[in-house]
Amino acid sequence: MAELIEEVSTATHASLNACDPIVVNSEALPMQALYQLSATGAQQQNQQIPIGLSNSLLYQQLAAHQQIAAQQHQQQLAVSAAHQTQNNIMLATSAPSLINHMENSTDGKVKDDPNSDYDLQLSIQQQLAAAAQAAQMGQTQIGPQIVGQQGQPVVATTAGSTNGSAAVTQPDPSTSSGPDGPKRLHVSNIPFRFRDPDLKTMFEKFGVVSDVEIIFNERGSKGFGFVTMERPQDAERARQELHGSMIEGRKIEVNCATARVHSKKVKPTGGILDQMNPLMAQSALAAQAQMNRALLLRSPLVAQSLLGRGAALIPGMQQPAFQLQAALAGNPLAQLQGQPLLFNAAALQTNALQQSAFGMDPAAVQAALLANEQARFQLAAAAAQGRIPSSGNASAFGEQYLSNALATASLPSYQMNPALRTLNRFTPY
């Protein structure tokens, strides 16, 4: 304070001597130089514009007023925070009574809650902790949180600071779903003669049966099935009554069926593409028979022997020619196995006519029939001359060695048992 008075007196003395030029020259110059030095240092340090002594007094007064206003504002904030905390505590205290009042007004009865005191104390402690944390973080609290009886927080939001009414939101109990009872039953160890109507009759006395399914395989019933009932209560009663009962000497087991598990096995598509289709199997057998017949007819000796014995060649013409070509192309040994033994031109011409007959050409069919008749007469005449092979009778060469094997070779070389099993397969469905 003394330093401030000295500065004021010095400034007054300097202002009084400012009118005298002599005094200005003698006394004001050292003061002005000192002031300039101090102003230059202040400018270098704070980078601010220098001010006079009179302005510094005003600046100090303004700073003091600002500090006082800031302190008053902080006090007001502290008072408002205390009022807010008190209101929150009062609201938390009155919330359980408000809830009980609402329940009493709805039911018309007074419900005593033994855990209300403990919940109230716990909610007050939580509110105090939340208020302290909000005061530290500098955030205003929107509304209190009330902990319910089940340990789930129930948010209470204030509609406004004037009315003070609170709207309490509680979780909806209808959203919680409980497990339903069993409806589908698994029945095992049933008699093998049982069918769906028998199993349905056994369960109809307990309630309405919506579906019955007994599992079968190729040999018949597998001895178990599934029963689906309309109501879970009926299914449970049927399970309790029938489980362990004896039917035709077999102990019936009834249990709750688990969820169906669909296998990832790829099922073949039905129709022509199915290899187990009877029509497809018959077509494959016909193609195999035609290929075997064509391989046999490539040899002139075998062809003439078959014609002499009256082997039918016309049924082989009923299959289209492209099937024969596809079958021959699929067999790489067909050309090696079917190399004809060229003994004369007549046999080669007969073979060519027979091959052209497979194409369903009418002219080729007539030529094949004519060649068949001619060859039959020739073989009948040659048989009367004797069976000693010679160079002049090349058509009968080797016939005495092949007479026993030609009858078997004329038949198609495929097995009939797989075809019969395919056609006569038992399907219980």
Swiss-Prot record:
Residue ranges, compositional bias (Low complexity): 156-180
Keyword tRNA-binding found: no
PROSITE patterns: RRM
Gene Ontology cellular-component terms listed: cytoplasm; nucleus
Example of a GO biological process term: mating behavior
Database matches in Gene3D superfamilies: 3.30.70.330
MF term (GO), any: poly(G) binding
Alphabetical list of InterPro entries matching this protein: FOX1_RRM, Nucleotide-bd_a/b_plait_sf, RBD_domain_sf, RBFOX1-like, RRM_dom
Keywords: Differentiation, Nucleus, RNA-binding, Sexual differentiation, Transcription, Transcription regulation
Ranges where the record places region Disordered: 156-188
Domain RRM, chain residue ranges per copy: 183-259
Quaternary state and interactors: Interacts with sup-12.
Protein name: Sex determination protein fox-1
Annotated source species: Caenorhabditis elegans
